[in-house]
Amino acid sequence: MSDLAIVIMAAGLGSRFGGTKQLVDVGPNGEVFFDFAIADSIAAGADRVVLIVRREFADTVEEHVRSMHGDIDLHLVCQDETNAPTRKKPWGTAHAILAAKGAVDRPFIVVNADDYYGVESYQLVADELREAGESTVVLAAFELCRTLPNEGSVSRGVCAADGQVLTKLVETHGIERNTDGIIVSADPPGTLTDLTPVSMNMWGFRVSIFDHLERMWAEFLDAHRDTEKTEFLLPSVVAELMGAGLLEVKVVPVASDWIGVTNPADLDPARAALADLRS
C-alpha cells in the first residue's frame, strides 16, 4: 500500500494555445502530457490518480486514461461543478486543489496537466514529501535554462531560498534570452542566470492544506464572487500562509528538463524532445 497521490490540474482553458492542449498527443506512443505524469508518479510510489477537469471533456479524459493505463485508482473531479459560481474561466489553481479534497486522503503531488517534468522530479518530491512535517510544503525548483523555449518570452516563478527553505516566490514576466545570450526579464526588469531556480507549479502537500484552502477560499469568494477573471492561485495562497508563519516551503532542486507548450508552434519541438526522452 502506498501513501501518495498525484493530483493533475487539467481544467485550464489554454487560451493562447487555441484549444484543449491537455488532450493533444505529444508522446511517441500517442501520449498526452499527463500520461507521463501518471506513469512517472506511479513509478515514484503513487497509487491514486486524481484528475481535475471540466465536465465537458471528463468522459473523454477517462476513456483516454483507461486506454493508456488500465485499471488504476482513478478519480475525476470536475472543477466547474465544485463550490463556486458559474463562469467561463476556471477559478484558479488553488480552487482546483480544493475541488479535489474529497478524492485525496494522503500526501499528494500537484502538477499541471500540460507540462512534462521528468522522471526524476517525481521521485525527488515524493521522497521529500514522505519526510515532511504537517506544516511543510515541498516545491520542485527547476533550472531556468531547462525551461526556456527556443523563441519568445515566458513567465516563471523565480525562487529565493535560505538553504532549502523558500523565502520568496516572485512571478517574473517577459523572460527571454537576448541576442547576447543573456537571460533578461521585463517585469520586474533584471538579469537572471541559467541556474536561477524557478517553479513550474510542481508541489507536494499534506492533507492539512485543505483546511487552509477552505478558509481562504471563503474569504476570496466574498471579495471576488462577481468577477470573471480574478483567480484563486496556489502561489499566492502559499505566500500568504508563509507570511503568517503557518507553513514552510522546502525547495527541492531538480535537474530534469521541463517540456511544455504555450502556442501551437511549440508542439513539434515538444514532440521531438519527448521522442528522444521516452522512445
Regions found by a protein language model. Name each.
Residues D162-G163, R177-S279:
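Conserved alpha/beta core of the MobA/IspD/sugar-nucleotide pyrophosphorylase nucleotidyltransferase superfamily
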Residues L13, D114-D115, L144:
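Active-site metal-binding loops of divalent metal-dependent hydrolases
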Residues K21-V26, T86-R87, V154:
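Short glycine-enriched, charge-decorated loop/helix-capping segments at active-site entrances
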Residues E81-T86, R146-T147, I175-R177, W258-I259:
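A short acidic, often aromatic-flanked loop/helix-cap motif at beta-alpha or helix-coil junctions
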Residues M1-I8, P28-V110, Y117, Y122-L124, ...:
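Conserved N-terminal catalytic core of the sugar/cofactor nucleotidyltransferase
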Residues V77-Q79, A99, A140, T172, ...:
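Conserved beta-strand termini and adjacent loop/short-helix elements that scaffold enzyme active sites
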Residues M1-T20, V24:
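N-terminal nucleotide-binding beta1-loop-alpha1 segment
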Residues V119-W203, V207:
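Conserved core of the sugar-phosphate nucleotidyltransferase
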